[in-house]
């Protein structure tokens, strides 16, 4: 029986004309590259896979942790909007340290 490895992923969606904010998707997938293609289909701008973290069976717990931690930045569902500097200097390092 094949075991599926789950990942928590971080994606960035480009938004035309907006340069001081980043739109970030934090989610779970067993195939983040395939998930990226699905997300790209629904977005007008380019979407990039920034980082994946192998999370195993607890992937949804880890995802939920970050959704709660950043709920004030939520724009709906798994999407969050951060100032560029805040994301680069605080959010991404927190996620890397967490995993």
Where do the PLM segments sit?
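Non-catalytic accessory segments flanking enzymatic or RNA/DNA-binding domains
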Residues: 1-99
């Amino acid at each position: 029986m094949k075991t599926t490895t789950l990942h928590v992923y971080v994606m960035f969606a480009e938004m035309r004309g907006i340069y001081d904010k980043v739109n970030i998707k934090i989610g779970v997938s067993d195939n983040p590259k395939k998930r990226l293609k699905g997300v790209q289909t629904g977005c007008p701008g380019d979407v990039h896979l920034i980082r994946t973290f192998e999370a195993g069976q607890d992937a949804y717990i880890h995802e939920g942790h970050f959704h709660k931690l950043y709920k004030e930045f939520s724009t709906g569902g798994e999407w969050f909007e951060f100032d560029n500097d805040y994301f680069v200097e605080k959010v991404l390092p927190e996620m890397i340290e967490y995993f």
